[in-house]
């Protein structure tokens, strides 16, 4: 939705005129989520004074790009998206164009889109990018200091004996790109909290929290616990009823590098998971 300002007016007043049933709290949330733009730039406050001729844009709650990427949030510092499965997060030696990072750069017409973390090609869900060097450094520091909270859901083979707990090991990748636990001297510390939220005789649905962010960490920890993620052939899964790896990045919480406000984004579980587990009850 777009409209042109015909006379000088406060942003809050013009929004109340167009959305009389929306509270001030709701309108403020639109500001914080990057839904309101003034002449193509993100509005910073409800109290800003608008001048005649300026253009105000109210964006939808999210934008779905042609490739199936759902843009949940976008401003001058960060982009938060929901990545579909079977899409590379960033460029590799074998693929540079058909990646989430490059598609965002092209589709959103961004000069810079910096990766601050990754999801495996087979994993769907929440992912975040930085739009400038300052934001990139801030977010990378938050990751390094374990200030960012990431929650995943995974369907795994078998039922866990222990309902909840913590997996901890040192991981190392070999020359064939296979990651496994190793000795303290040779590996990097990886810590995963797990909670079994549903199970039957064949499968279990786990809520997983990354306390560290090592390559293939969740896949390795589940597999080495005797419960490989459904569809994860690389780490010894025997079944693939969903025809995809059943790992989903569900939520992400971080401190906005400019606004200095804690933000949380959620990507609901894929409906395909419901073929095995009753995800609607979560």
Regions picked out by a protein language model, each given a short descriptive name:
Residues 1-282:
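RNA pseudouridine synthases
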């Amino acid at each position: 939705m777009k409209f042109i300002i015909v006379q000088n007016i406060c942003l809050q007043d013009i929004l109340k005129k167009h959305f009389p049933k929306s509270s001030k709290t709701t309108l403020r949330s639109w500001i914080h989520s990057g839904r309101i733009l003034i002449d193509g730039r993100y509005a910073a406050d409800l109290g800003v004074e608008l001048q005649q001729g300026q253009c105000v844009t109210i964006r939808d709650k999210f934008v779905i790009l042609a490739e199936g990427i759902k843009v949940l949030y976008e401003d001058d510092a960060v982009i938060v998206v929901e990545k579909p499965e079977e899409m590379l997060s960033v460029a590799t030696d074998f693929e540079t164009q058909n990646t989430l990072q490059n598609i965002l750069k092209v589709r959103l017409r961004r000069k810079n889109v910096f990766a601050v973390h990754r999801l495996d090609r087979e994993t769907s869900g929440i992912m975040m990018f930085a739009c400038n060097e300052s934001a990139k450094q801030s977010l990378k520091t938050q990751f390094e200091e374990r200030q960012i909270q990431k929650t995943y859901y995974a369907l795994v083979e078998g039922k866990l004996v222990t309902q909840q707990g913590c997996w901890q090991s040192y991981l190392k990748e070999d020359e064939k790109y296979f990651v496994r636990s190793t000795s303290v001297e040779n590996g990097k510390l990886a810590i995963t909290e797990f909670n079994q939220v549903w199970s039957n005789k064949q499968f279990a649905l786990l809520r997983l929290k990354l306390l560290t962010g090592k390559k293939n960490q969740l896949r390795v920890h589940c597999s080495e616990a005797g419960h490989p993620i459904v569809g994860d052939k690389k780490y010894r899964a025997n079944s693939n009823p969903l025809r995809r790896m059943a790992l989903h990045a569900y939520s992400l919480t971080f401190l906005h590098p400019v606004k200095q406000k804690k933000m949380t984004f959620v990507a609901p579980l894929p409906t395909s998971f419901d073929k095995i587990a009753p995800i609607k009850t979560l």
